[in-house]
């Protein structure tokens, strides 16, 4: 019996659909297909299939460089690769399912699929010239530079304020300004540190927006307010 032969363009689309289904189940945004990421993924899948190599650095580069070569301007890039082999071949859905299932059963690959900051995806699948049917799948995730977040925090109050973003906390002294750039999404939290006669308390928290300035101001009875405006430098 002849080996099954999958429709590779349909396999690519089904991998995207399955990936987005997993993300939706985790309350994450669905990824949109980006032609440049797809170009990079296909080119690398074909290279791995031809060469017999299987790594993220088989071409001497890395996922970010491959994305840039294809014309993508990344803020963040991640990559999954899979190799599936069977003497019976694969039908279209089976090959897509096997690639995604393998990634989901691997912690680092699963983390890429569930990358909260990713907004775009490109998938490439290629057949190896080996006599036994073997397929290479490459899945690239990206967030373009145009979707990076840059904002400013200014402390005009008379107090030190703790500022926490993406797991890192800094103390903002009076008259201190911080400019933050990030490819990841997350909340920014402002807290008034605990004192000798008072416990620390949260002032406010936001999902920071690109180009915004968050200004801390002294209010009545020691209260601190936050004014949100446009950061002219980030326009």
Model regions and ranges:
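Intrinsically disordered, low-complexity Pro/Gly/Ser/Thr-rich segments with frequent PxxP/GP/PP motifs
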Residues: 166-185
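Beta-strand-rich domain onsets/edges
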Residues: 2, 139-145
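Short, well-ordered surface patches within globular domains
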Residues: 3-68, 115-122, 130
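A well-ordered secondary-structure block
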Residues: 63-140
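Asparagine-centered strand-capping/turn motif at beta-strand->loop junctions
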Residues: 147-160, 218
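Short, surface-exposed beta-strand/strand-loop-strand elements in extracellular ectodomains
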Residues: 158-168
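Extracellular beta-sheet/turn segments enriched in Thr/Pro/Gly and aliphatic residues
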Residues: 199-235
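A short, solvent-exposed beta-strand micro-motif common in secreted/extracellular proteins
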Residues: 184-198, 202-203
């Amino acid at each position: 019996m002849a080996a099954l032969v999958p429709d590779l363009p349909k396999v690519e689309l089904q991998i995207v659909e399955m990936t987005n289904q997993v993300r939706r189940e985790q309350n994450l945004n669905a990824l949109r297909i980006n032609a440049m990421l797809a170009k990079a993924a296909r080119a690398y899948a074909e290279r791995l299939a031809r060469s017999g190599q299987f790594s993220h650095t088989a071409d001497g580069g890395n996922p970010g460089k491959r994305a840039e070569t294809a014309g993508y301007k990344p803020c963040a890039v991640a990559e999954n690769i899979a190799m599936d082999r069977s003497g019976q071949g694969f039908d279209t859905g089976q090959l897509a399912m096997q690639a995604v299932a393998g990634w989901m059963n691997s912690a680092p690959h699963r983390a890429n699929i569930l990358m909260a900051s990713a907004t775009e995806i490109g998938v490439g699948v290629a057949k190896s010239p080996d006599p036994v049917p073997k397929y290479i799948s490459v899945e690239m995730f990206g967030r373009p530079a145009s979707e990076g977040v840059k904002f400013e925090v200014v402390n005009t109050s008379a107090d030190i304020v703790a500022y926490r973003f993406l797991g890192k906390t800094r103390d903002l002294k009076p008259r201190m300004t911080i400019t933050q750039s990030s490819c990841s999404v997350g909340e920014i939290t402002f807290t008034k540190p605990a004192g000798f006669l008072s416990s620390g308390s949260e002032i406010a928290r936001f999902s920071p927006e690109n180009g915004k300035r968050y200004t801390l101001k002294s209010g009545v009875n020691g209260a601190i307010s936050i004014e949100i405006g446009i950061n002219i430098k980030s326009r």
